[in-house]
Amino acid sequence: MPAIFTHEGKVEGVPGNYPLTAENLFRIGLALCTLWILDKEIEEPTLSIPETNFVTLALSVGFMNAGGSVNVGKGGDIKLFLQKGEIYVLEFQPLSETDIKKLESILFGRAPIPKKTGEDIGSFKC
């Protein structure tokens, strides 16, 4: 399976095709939130997305399933920058080179990524 992140730490692709499939975006959101909970020690991280569309919503569902909250157009612990065109470009800030390696380790590791259930699932705010 090809790498998800470019050497600049971005995710690029056509929505619906790898790496921007619904399943993969869900897993990226899950891993991103898990990284912030475990590594940054933020109990309920917040992801800020610029708008709602297939890409941002698939990512958001994974992020919320890990226990984080998602805001549209407001501040958060993590901010998603989205460049649309024939190829979509997703950039997360702040995200260091080390963070990217940790994310890929979570995504491609043998252990399942932890998921929250019930009331522990995060929220979505417009």
UniProtKB/Swiss-Prot annotation:
Protein name: Uncharacterized protein aq_1627
Organism: Aquifex aeolicus (strain VF5)
